[in-house]
């Protein structure tokens, strides 16, 4: 039966939400009511499937799935007032921590002046951010297109590569197995997981997938394309596959891919949406091999965990295809003043506090600890790997991974699996995580594994 629109009901919902936004704390009864409300609304109006996938943080009926506010730079607080060390980092958005005061202040100051731009006049922060990224990024990267997410930055990169290479008779893209580049139609064509791809087949033509980290497979794809006249326009890959399970390629792989691109006249697109902004111990992961891409995709942490923003940065030679008609690819909210303010403040924090170097140091501490635990619990843990503050613990099967996430939640540490690899638990905390909290995370992981081992032995 169709229901009639209700302005009164919508107005009541808005008033209720605005009241919640104003509050800093909730009474016990308010907390219980809000939890019931949120779960019900997700079931009836968002997507009931999300509730099943949050099972690792709902054990024991503690309503932990409903978060309330940031606790500190490195923690979250739920509606019960329980504080959790954040080792998930919003899948890589909180590199400078939660509500970093420098970023929040910049956004608040810009909000007091002008939240969004007119679309017609030139906006200064977009210009300054583009100049900043040209200075910060490696090689000849010079021009920036701004958007709102990683998927959008990948879409822009693919369109830019097409516009550049189509007149040269090159139309095919090489992506890699295990890749995740987003879920919009173009980005999904480069993404490798069948679960995400099959419901939307056929995807865009002209994408080949080769084994990640295998330079011989990459060379063969280039050679076959040359022989058949189906030449390669561009290679798109992640320096480290995040959603694929934090998969690191062999040392020198990116360098060899760059050489192949140069040899065959293809563009190199690096998707650093997750690995960029200091996450792996360098500002950009490609800097570990001094590789310079033709197009670089950024998002997630670029907005400092305060505003959504993505960027597609390219060399002048490539970007010049948009010079004659800059309206070939645009977006209403891309590069808006609030987002640019957040990005500029984020870069300032990363550089002034030398957070990439901190990520390397703290990441080494955590990874050493996780590898020791892997040696102690071989029946549960298959591997521990990573670079900087992008790490993964791979368990023997999916269910063991879920159990670890649930046990860590009981220890007040938030972790989760990766999208392409459910048995792999990602460890991706803010780069601001203190040494003391690193030690607490390792202690919690040890406690979680010990509890899991006892459970296995009892069975």
UniProtKB/Swiss-Prot annotation:
Pathway: Amine and polyamine degradation; putrescine degradation; 4-aminobutanal from putrescine (transaminase route): step 1/1
Protein name from the UniProt record: Putrescine aminotransferase
Gene Ontology BP annotations: L-lysine catabolic process; putrescine catabolic process
KW Transferase (keyword) present: yes
Free-text function comment from the UniProt entry: Catalyzes the aminotransferase reaction from putrescine to 2-oxoglutarate, leading to glutamate and 4-aminobutanal, which spontaneously cyclizes to form 1-pyrroline. This is the first step in one of two pathways for putrescine degradation, where putrescine is converted into 4-aminobutanoate (gamma-aminobutyrate or GABA) via 4-aminobutanal. Also functions as a cadaverine transaminase in a a L-lysine degradation pathway to succinate that proceeds via cadaverine, glutarate and L-2-hydroxyglutarate.
Stored Gene3D superfamilies: Aspartate Aminotransferase, domain 1, Type I PLP-dependent aspartate aminotransferase-like (Major domain)
Pfam families: Aminotran_3 (PF00202)
Cofactor: pyridoxal 5'-phosphate
UniProt lineage: Bacteria, Pseudomonadati, Pseudomonadota, Gammaproteobacteria, Enterobacterales
Residues reported to bind pyridoxal 5'-phosphate: 150-151, 274, 332
GO molecular function, one term: diamine transaminase activity
Chain positions with N6-(pyridoxal phosphate)lysine modification: 300
HAMAP family, sorted: Putres_aminotrans_3
Family: Belongs to the class-III pyridoxal-phosphate-dependent aminotransferase family. Putrescine aminotransferase subfamily.
Superkingdom of origin: Bacteria
InterPro entries, alphabetized: Aminotrans_3, Aminotrans_3_PPA_site, Class-III_PLP-dep_AT, Putrescine_aminotransferase, PyrdxlP-dep_Trfase, PyrdxlP-dep_Trfase_major, PyrdxlP-dep_Trfase_small
Record keywords: Aminotransferase, Pyridoxal phosphate, Transferase
Annotated EC: 2.6.1.82, 2.6.1.29
Originating species: Salmonella arizonae (strain ATCC BAA-731 / CDC346-86 / RSK2980)
Catalytic reaction annotation: an alkane-alpha,omega-diamine + 2-oxoglutarate = an omega-aminoaldehyde + L-glutamate; putrescine + 2-oxoglutarate = 1-pyrroline + L-glutamate + H2O; cadaverine + 2-oxoglutarate = 5-aminopentanal + L-glutamate
């Amino acid at each position: 039966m169709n229901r009639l629109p209700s302005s009164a009901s919508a107005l009541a919902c808005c008033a209720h939400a605005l009241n919640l936004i104003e509050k800093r704390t909730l009474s016990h009864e308010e907390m219980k009511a809000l939890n019931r409300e949120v779960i019900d609304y997700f079931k009836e109006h968002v997507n009931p499937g999300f509730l099943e996938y949050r099972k690792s943080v709902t054990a024991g009926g503690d309503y932990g799935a409903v978060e309330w506010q940031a606790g500190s730079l490195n923690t979250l607080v739920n509606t019960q007032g329980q504080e959790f060390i954040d080792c998930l980092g919003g899948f890589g958005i909180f590199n400078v921590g939660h509500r970093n005061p420098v970023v929040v202040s910049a956004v608040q100051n810009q909000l007091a002046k002008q939240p969004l731009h007119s679309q017609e006049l030139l906006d200064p922060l977009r210009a300054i951010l583009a100049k900043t990224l040209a200075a910060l990024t490696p090689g000849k990267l010079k021009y920036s297109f701004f958007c709102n997410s990683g998927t959008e930055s990948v879409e822009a990169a693919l369109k830019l590569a097409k516009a550049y290479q189509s007149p040269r008779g090159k139309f095919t893209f090489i992506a890699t197995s295990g890749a995740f580049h987003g879920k919009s139609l173009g980005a999904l064509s480069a993404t490798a997981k069948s679960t995400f791809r099959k419901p939307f087949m056929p995807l865009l033509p002209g994408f080949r997938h080769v084994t990640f980290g295998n330079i011989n497979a990459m060379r063969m794809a280039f050679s076959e394309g040359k022989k058949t006249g189906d030449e390669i326009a561009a290679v798109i890959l992640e320096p480290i596959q995040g959603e694929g399970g934090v998969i690191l390629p062999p040392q020198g792989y990116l360098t060899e891919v760059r050489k192949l691109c140069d040899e065959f006249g293809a563009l190199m697109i690096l998707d650093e949406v997750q690995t960029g902004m200091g996450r792996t111990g360098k500002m950009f992961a490609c800097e570990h091999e001094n590789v310079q891409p033709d197009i670089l995709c950024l998002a997630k942490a670029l907005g400092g965990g305060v505003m959504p923003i993505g960027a597609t940065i390219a060399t002048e030679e490539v970007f010049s295809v948009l010079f004659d008609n800059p309206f070939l690819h645009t977006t209403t909210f891309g590069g808006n003043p609030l987002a640019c303010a957040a990005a500029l403040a984020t870069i300032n924090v990363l550089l002034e506090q030398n957070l990439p170097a901190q990520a390397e140091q703290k990441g080494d501490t955590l990874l050493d600890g996780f590898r020791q635990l892997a040696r102690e619990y071989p029946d549960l843990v298959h591997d521990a790997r990573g670079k900087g503050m992008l790490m993964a613990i791979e368990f023997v099967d999916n269910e063991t991974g879920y159990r670890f996430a649930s046990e860590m939640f009981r220890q007040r540490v938030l972790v989760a699996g990766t999208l392409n690899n459910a048995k792999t638990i990602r460890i991706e905390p803010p780069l601001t995580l203190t040494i003391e909290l690193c030690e607490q995370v390792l202690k919690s992981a040890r406690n979680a594994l010990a509890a899991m081992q006892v459970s296995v032995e009892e069975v």
